[in-house]
Regions:
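Small-residue-rich helix-loop
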Residues: 232-273, 279, 286
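Eukaryote-biased recognition of C-terminal alpha-helical segments
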Residues: 312-345
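Short, Lys/Arg-enriched, disordered terminal segments
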Residues: 1-9, 337, 343-345
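C-terminal hydrophobic structural anchor segments
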Residues: 268-317
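Glycine-rich phosphate-binding segment of PLP-dependent enzymes
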Residues: 30-37
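Basic- and aromatic-enriched surface patches that contact anionic nucleotides/nucleic acids
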Residues: 2-26, 39-238, 318-326
Length: 345
């Protein structure tokens, strides 16, 4: 019989939280000093309207409890916002100076002018600078509860927490969450390669995908399937998370940079319409098959045979591997191996 209590205790041991009561002034100071980071993935999605921002400010003035801010502690001791970016950004847009606002790319936005307040009607049409110093100080000294996930917590727990807390707020894609959780050299490497011109010509994405981390995820898929295919079971998300958490160790950046750029230079030369199969956007499973298959062939032979590629991309056997239950391990292996053999000639 499964010991439910043991399972509960095992999972709880992976999570370590600390709780703080911080004033608005302290939070703004921490943002200004770089101790609190709001990831670019969050910054681009700050979209509360003026009325909603004003309502939060009114609640803070009146001492009405607002939801806690959730942060994750990084290895260097800084905090990363997990949940509460809209609330923190509102405080910054209302009471932050130019230096603080610049930290969240809000310097070009006009300071918040309160609107639609019902309890504090005389505060409407006022900015922070328009308020008496005593009123400003009361706002700055308002306390906010902050809960931080310590850096001792398991990386998978951090990813899970980001995912859970963002389901009702800012909708980040799995790769945007990875970019927040697995910060470091490998994450920076993915972002750099995602800008490669040949790669961009080969892979066609929708407008929304161009801005949600999909390009970085495709670079991650390329290396994950190239080097860690044996670890893949069925969940692509878990597979990519696991690879990203360990890829930084012993990864040869210079060799893999050269490999990636070489493969996509060759593919771009022979696929003027990209990896598309006649579609506007590139199917992810076809991308995996063609790019990883080409890389394996190049690693084995120092070249990629592209003769007849237009014909064999229409082959019924390949079609079988990229339709239906495409994330089953046999089909992933099947489509990559099919392309590898074709590229080897």
């Amino acid at each position: 019989m499964i010991d439910l209590n043991s399972e509960l205790m095992e999972q709880k041991m992976k999570v370590d939280f600390n709780t703080y009561d911080l004033s608005v002034k302290e939070l703004l100071s921490m943002v200004n000093d770089g101790l609190i980071n709001i990831a670019p993935e969050y910054q681009r999605q700050f979209r509360w309207d003026v009325e909603r921002q004003s309502s939060l400010v009114e609640s803070l003035f009146l001492g009405i409890p607002v939801p806690s801010l959730f942060m994750a502690t990084n290895v260097d001791g800084t905090w990363e916002v997990i949940d509460g970016v809209q609330r923190l950004s509102t405080m910054i847009c209302f009471a932050g100076d130019d230096n603080v606002r610049e930290k969240v790319n809000a310097k070009k936005v006009e300071p918040l002018k309160l609107k639609g307040l019902s309890k504090l009607a005389n505060f409407n049409d006022k900015r922070f600078a328009d308020l008496p110093v005593g009123v400003q100080n009361k706002f700055k000294l308002t306390s906010i509860k902050v809960i931080t996930l310590s850096d001792k917590s398991d990386k998978d727990v951090r990813f899970d927490l980001f995912e859970r807390l963002n389901k009702g707020g800012v909708n980040l894609t799995p790769q945007e969450i990875r970019s927040c959780v697995y910060r470091g050299g490998f994450n920076d490497f993915l972002k750099e390669l995602s800008k490669d011109s040949n790669f961009k010509n080969c892979v066609h994405l929708s407008e929304s995908q161009e801005n949600d981390g999909t390009r970085e995820e495709l670079v991650l898929r390329f290396f994950a399937y190239l080097y860690d295919l044996d670890s893949f079971e069925h969940s692509v998300k878990d597979f990519l998370n696991n690879y990203m958490s360990k890829a930084d160790k012993g990864f040869n950046y210079s060799e893999n940079d050269k490999l990636f750029r070489t493969v996509f230079k060759i593919l771009n030369d022979v696929l003027p319409n990209g990896i598309s199969k006649g579609r506007k956007n590139t199917p992810l499973n076809l991308f995996e098959a063609v790019s990883v298959g080409a890389a394996l062939a190049y690693m084995d032979n120092g070249k990629i045979n592209t003769v007849g590629i237009d014909e064999w991309l229409k082959d019924k056997e390949l079609l079988k591997y990229i339709t239906g239950a495409t994330n089953s391990k046999p089909r992933v292996i099947g489509r990559i191996e099919f392309c590898r053999k074709k590229f080897e000639g």
